[in-house]
Swiss-Prot record:
Family the entry assigns: Belongs to the transferase hexapeptide repeat family. LpxD subfamily.
Listed SUPFAM superfamilies: Trimeric LpxA-like enzymes
Coiled coil feature spans: none
Pfam families: Hexapep (PF00132), LpxD (PF04613)
Pathway: Bacterial outer membrane biogenesis; LPS lipid A biosynthesis
E.C. designation(s): 2.3.1.191
Molecular-function annotations in GO: N-acyltransferase activity
Source species of the chain: Desulfotalea psychrophila (strain LSv54 / DSM 12343)
Catalytic reaction(s) noted: a UDP-3-O-[(3R)-3-hydroxyacyl]-alpha-D-glucosamine + a (3R)-hydroxyacyl-[ACP] = a UDP-2-N,3-O-bis[(3R)-3-hydroxyacyl]-alpha-D-glucosamine + holo-[ACP] + H(+)
Name assigned to this protein: UDP-3-O-acylglucosamine N-acyltransferase
Length: 345
């Protein structure tokens, strides 16, 4: 972790404007409420601006429109949330110091492993594995045969990378996740018996992808399951065989994507959303949490509900649903009035 960095240096990283003393030294990124001398923090909610007048922080990242005076040095930016992420990451970065391969790790035959790696205790590495420089593999990771892992990767404890999987550069995979497990494919005969279809494809994970804990990315039946560059996948996500997740897409916890569905660039799937198989979901689509996607979606669509439909239409249906008990009373009263009128005739 970096210490004693000037505010001016941090502002330069994010194209920020310094208001106050740019030579103030900071090194610890904390919340606005707890920040003290030597700390840097950020303000996102406009309603919290009053905290700026009393903060003890060394520096605060704020939006350019904020005009409140503060004892702290301010860094004014166009997007405080984004700037905070960049600065926090910079402060936490350490120069990679390779520790080599732990004596309890197992390494198979024909492997090409950079000398600039850290491979912790009880890691198992299969045959013909390639691992690039500055990659860190933590305890209990299992790597199958013919796997390729690029530069600057991080595999947390107990990750499994199955045979033939390909990881690009800068990939982070958190504990318990399985890459390359068999896809779910069976053929059923007339008697109802299920016969497993061989799953002989692979998984490709491109550069700068991050996958959370306890998620599964299944290998393709044939060809590739493909997670493209910059995609960010949360914990507890299921990605089935032959799925394609487009560049910079965001897949939130408990999402399930069925086989052979393809997502475009910058798609967002909210928590617990699901998509059936063999769909085409266009660039920039946003799918509300808990939705069920049953048909193709054009680029830029914003949808919600089951089945997923345009977001305004779904919201209207939700409002109407909450009014059903009241509407039922009105219908009963109306029915009674009609029956009374009919009886008089």
């Amino acid at each position: 972790m970096k210490e004693n960095i000037t505010v001016a240096m941090l502002a330069e990283l994010v194209d920020g404007e310094v208001i106050g003393d740019g030579e103030v030294l900071v090194g610890n990124f904390v919340s606005l409420e707890t920040a003290g001398e030597g700390d840097i923090t950020f303000l996102v909610k406009a309603g919290d601006q009053d905290l700026l007048t009393s903060t003890k922080a060394g520096a605060v990242i704020v939006h350019r429109k904020v005009e409140v005076e503060s004892p702290a040095t301010l860094i004014k930016v166009d997007d405080a949330y984004l700037a905070a992420a960049k600065i926090h990451t910079f402060l936490l970065e350490d120069e990679f110091s390779p520790e080599g391969i732990h004596r309890s790790a197992f390494v198979g035959e024909g492997c090409q492993i950079s000398s600039e790696v850290t491979i912790k205790a009880l890691v198992s590495i299969g045959n013909r594995v390639v691992i690039g420089p500055r990659t860190r593999i933590e305890s209990g990771v299992a790597i199958g045969d013919d796997v390729t892992i690029g530069e600057d990767c991080l595999l947390k404890a107990n990750v499994t990378i199955a045979d033939g999987s390909q990881l690009g550069n800068g990939v982070t995979i958190h504990s318990g996740t399985v890459i390359g497990s068999d896809g779910y494919g069976y053929a059923t005969d007339k008697m109802g018996f299920h016969y497993k279809r061989p799953q002989v494809g692979t998984v490709r994970v491109d550069d700068n992808v991050e996958i959370g804990a306890n998620s599964c990315v299944d290998r393709a039946t044939y060809g590739l399951t493909w997670i493209k560059s910059g995609a960010k996948i949360d914990n507890l996500v299921q990605i089935a065989h032959n799925v394609v997740v487009g560049e910079n897409s965001l897949i939130v916890s408990q999402v399930g994507i069925s086989g052979s569905t393809s997502l475009g660039r910058n798609v967002v799937m909210g928590g617990k959303a699901a998509a059936v198989g063999h769909l085409q979901i266009g660039d920039g689509v946003m799918i509300a949490g808990g939705s069920g996607v049953l048909s193709n979606l054009s680029a830029g669509a914003v949808v919600g509900g089951i089945p997923a439909r345009p977001i305004k239409q779904w919201r209207k249906s939700v409002v109407l649903t909450t009014k059903l008990p009241e509407m039922q009373k009105d219908i009963r009263a109306l029915k009674k009035s009609v029956e009374e009128l009919a009886g008089k005739n």
